[in-house]
Amino acid sequence: MKSKKQTKLLLILDGWGYSETIQNNAIALANTPVWDKLNQTFLHSLIHTSGKDVGLPGKQMGNSEVGHLNLGAGRIVKQDFTRIYNELQNGDFFRNPILKNSLEYANDNNKAVHIMGLLSDGGVHSHEEQIHAMLEMTHKQGCKNVYLHLFTDGRDCAQKSAEKYIQKFEEKMAILGTGEIVSIIGRYFSMDRDNRWSRIRCAYELIAKGKAKFLAQSALHAVELAYARGETDEFIQSTSIKIPISIKKGDVLIFMNYRADRARQITRAFTDENLQGFSRGTFVPTQFICLTEYKKDFNLPVAYPSSKLNNVLGKYLSNLGMTQLRIAETEKYAHVTFFLNGGVEQAFNGEDRILIPSPDVATYDLQPEMSAFELTDALIESIESQKYDLIICNFANTDMVGHSGKLNATIKAVETIDSCLGIIHKAMFAISGEILITADHGNAEQMINPKTHEVHTAHTNNPVPLIFVSERKADISEPEKGALSDIAPTLLAMMDIEKPNEMTGNSLLTFK
């Protein structure tokens, strides 16, 4: 008979930030008796999740990919955004061999160059400066037919901000005398990650075939028409500009998003000959270029390949023969697996995974509970089994509902999490387990932009809570100075395991 484990649990409350402002703060306005009691009873602090603390430039807000990479790595991980940003500054971007070769191929074979990506300064999935730079590169290389397929944001920036990004881009095109915006579509369709292939199909048919729901005379006109229909940027329906343009066999298609999770499905639509999600009709092969590595087994040219992270938390525990569980609903499953494991897709030895399907609704404000209760049921069963040394669980609600910008729905999401926390605490107390509660970034604590007074749907730069739920006596080593890179060393300290040399983060707990 296997011995029962003294399970440690890391709870990641996605998008649960901290702000002293009460107004428009869904977390402060919610009824959270369990959360309040945990804060009153147990050791707690705040940690940092944005900018240089997580390997991003300056004051760039954090996000789930960046957060989970840092959580699992136990060190500050220099992000793709930062790598590319630095190369834009020193000019190396324009010498990137993969990008240069693709443009040379287009010139030599009289092929068009298509550039697609999310046009905003949100910095979570892409950045407008990088798309501007790609356009400049086509100009420097003398490319003739350069077509832009732009995704509008409205989620990692203001809901109706597309016009300013498009105006800047059109000014860049005018200066260079290169490029033509031929299609516009909201990220809701082009960047799905939850196998809602009907959305991806809308984007694919627009970009590949020029088949659109609407026709506009310019990109700005497309946005104007969308607003008149009551759509915000995230939800702009497929629109062709002037004359529909289709992709021809052998054309170059460069995808300028750098974050993997929302890039995978649309990439598969263009590159997977055996695509199961929807019928494309005749498959048209392209010279598809990924800005970063979206998935190893895609076997596609990558401008900025991933660098390997050694001795991340999951691998380190696996090498020690320990057992671990990763559990989340669909929307955050990749984060507690792929990203937390440093970009490794396959589970490590001794690592189990449980995926709880996210509800099939258009937007999560329609069901703010999401699948939190089903997730909690599965988590409780795993806790009671006492077969795991470490369980890592992500609750998606405060981030996914927070992105809707709907305050009342987000309050409901917070209260759902609070109910689940009560059940989880009881189960962990029964087995004498310990819980570390934190978040990957803020979101739900700021539902209105305090400067513009517009609905705020993006992440924040606010710190996030840290609570150590245990009967054990401990102190916070450096109150309010910690970062996400300190979480893995903290978990190892809770398990009485020395951290590996690669982990430069430090335990936030000192045990008495």
Swiss-Prot record:
> What residue intervals traverse the membrane?
none
Annotated positions binding substrate: 125, 155-156, 187, 193, 259-262, 332
Q: In which pathway does it act?
A: Carbohydrate degradation; glycolysis; pyruvate from D-glyceraldehyde 3-phosphate: step 3/5
Keyword ATP-binding in the entry? The reply is no
State the InterPro entries in the record. Alkaline_phosphatase_core_sf (IPR017850), BPG-indep_PGM_N (IPR011258), Metalloenzyme (IPR006124), PGAM_B_sf (IPR036646), Pgm_bpd_ind (IPR005995)
GO CC terms, sorted: cytosol
| Residues holding Mn(2+) 1 | 399, 403, 459
- Alphabetical keyword list: Glycolysis, Isomerase, Manganese, Metal-binding
- What Gene3D superfamilies does the annotation carry? Alkaline Phosphatase, subunit A, BPG-independent phosphoglycerate mutase, domain B
Q: Name one GO biological process term.
A: glycolytic process
ATP-binding as UniProt keyword:
no
Q: Name one Pfam family in it.
A: Metalloenzyme
- What residues bind Mn(2+) 2, as annotated? 14, 64, 440-441
Q: GO molecular-function annotation terms?
A: manganese ion binding; phosphoglycerate mutase activity
Q: Could you name the active-site residues?
A: 64 (phosphoserine intermediate)
On cofactor binding, the record's note says:
Binds 2 manganese ions per subunit.
Record's catalysed reaction(s): (2R)-2-phosphoglycerate = (2R)-3-phosphoglycerate
**What are the names of the required cofactors?**
Mn(2+)
Task: Give the source's domain of life in one word.
Answer: Bacteria
What EC number(s) does the entry state?
Answer: 5.4.2.12
What family does the entry list?
A: Belongs to the BPG-independent phosphoglycerate mutase family.
Q: How does it assemble?
A: Monomer.
Instruction: Report the protein's function.
Output: Catalyzes the interconversion of 2-phosphoglycerate and 3-phosphoglycerate.
NCBIfam families associated with the record: pgm_bpd_ind
Q: What name is this protein filed under? A: 2,3-bisphosphoglycerate-independent phosphoglycerate mutase
> What organism is the protein native to?
Ruthia magnifica subsp. Calyptogena magnifica
* Phylogenetic placement of the source organism: Bacteria, Pseudomonadati, Pseudomonadota, Gammaproteobacteria, Candidatus Pseudothioglobaceae
Gene that encodes the chain = gpmI
